Amino acid sequence: MFGLKQFYQNEVRAKLAQELDIKNPMLLPKLEKIVISVGAGAHAKDMKIMQNIAQTISLIAGQKAVITKAKKSVAGFKIREGMAVGAKVTLRNKRMYNFLEKLIVISLPRVKDFRGISRNGFDGRGNYTFGINEQLIFPEVVYDDIMVSHGMNITMVTSTDSDKEAFKLLELLGLPFAKVR
């Protein structure tokens, strides 16, 4: 792998400065963190499945996952306060760039009928979120080891407040956005 962090520092920053007309290099947008999260849904009651979900995203991220707990009880969903409801991993620095490179080069091309990720995942504050329907697109996940097939949300947090600047950053990093029709 060619080193996405070096690619960002050597090429992407120069292109961003030119295209966005930013003179101060400290104001250039950068990727701050990537959060991978999974909601367990109906499987939240089964602790073995929760452990398996946490183990799966730990394998994918290369870092230990944290099991998330409900902050409030919700009777409609049969959830009690403190009950395990999902798992998440927050990646920064080297692990973040390694994961992003693996996602772009290996995993996303393995998605069936892949035509690019949606451009609609920006939140208005420069962060981008998209979902993956199945964890099997990652090479670390072995089919026989998973108990439940689940998807995941991937959120990329950038240092900018502008969706336009964040889009340009992610596009230059190589994220395959869907073509506009």
UniProtKB/Swiss-Prot annotation:
Any matching Pfam family: Ribosomal_L5_C
Keyword terms, alphabetized: Ribonucleoprotein, Ribosomal protein, RNA-binding, rRNA-binding, tRNA-binding
PROSITE patterns documented for this protein: RIBOSOMAL_L5
MF term (GO), any: tRNA binding
GO cellular component, one term: ribonucleoprotein complex
UniProt cross-references to InterPro entries, sorted A to Z: Ribosomal_uL5 (IPR002132), Ribosomal_uL5_bac-type (IPR020930), Ribosomal_uL5_C (IPR031309), Ribosomal_uL5_CS (IPR020929), Ribosomal_uL5_dom_sf (IPR022803), Ribosomal_uL5_N (IPR031310)
GO biological process: translation
Role description: This is one of the proteins that bind and probably mediate the attachment of the 5S RNA into the large ribosomal subunit, where it forms part of the central protuberance. In the 70S ribosome it contacts protein S13 of the 30S subunit (bridge B1b), connecting the 2 subunits; this bridge is implicated in subunit movement. Contacts the P site tRNA; the 5S rRNA and some of its associated proteins might help stabilize positioning of ribosome-bound tRNAs.
Family: Belongs to the universal ribosomal protein uL5 family.
Quaternary structure (record): Part of the 50S ribosomal subunit; part of the 5S rRNA/L5/L18/L25 subcomplex. Contacts the 5S rRNA and the P site tRNA. Forms a bridge to the 30S subunit in the 70S ribosome.
Name by which UniProt lists this protein: Large ribosomal subunit protein uL5
Organism the protein comes from: Helicobacter pylori (strain Shi470)
Gene (UniProt): rplE
